[in-house]
A protein has these predicted regions:
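N-terminal, polar/charged subdomain of small-to-medium soluble alpha/beta proteins
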Residues: 1-95, 102-105, 110-131
Length: 131
């Protein structure tokens, strides 16, 4: 499995603004997760004895992602969602995930983005850091 070509956020936004839901949307918010050099244990738990990351083996469960997207649409004020996930062996700086979410007002969109990304990261993906 090899990594994918990253999407164009400009194209995504153009598509979203042409979608039938666009008249209800007052805000679009994007997320672009990338492979970083600092190990997850260092960033999240403050572990001092971690080696630099040189890459990541990344995979995901598409059915689980689709189910979480469907649940996110049930949140207040959310009318548009698009998600792209990479796969395979990734290098530092490579894109892992893109999310575009559109909704009526900022609090709804910010909360929905956090909900969606957290659930995808915690329930749908496998990230193996390479050293």
């Amino acid at each position: 499995m090899s990594k994918k070509t990253s999407p164009s956020m400009d194209s995504w936004l153009k598509e979203a603004k042409a979608h039938e839901s666009a008249p209800k949307i007052g805000m679009y918010l994007t997320h672009n997760g990338i492979v970083r050099k600092s190990a997850k244990a260092k960033v999240r738990q403050g572990a001092a004895d971690t080696r630099p990351v040189v890459g990541m083996q990344f995979s995901y469960n598409q059915e689980a992602v689709d189910a979480i997207i469907a649940e996110t649409y049930k949140l207040d004020g959310i009318f548009y969602i698009k998600v792209w996930l990479n796969e395979g062996k990734l290098s530092v700086g490579d894109d892992i995930m893109y999310v575009l979410i559109g909704g009526d007002i900022r609090p709804h969109v910010v909360d929905a983005l956090q909900y969606l990304v957290r659930r995808i990261k915690n329930e749908c993906v496998t990230e193996i850091e390479l050293y």
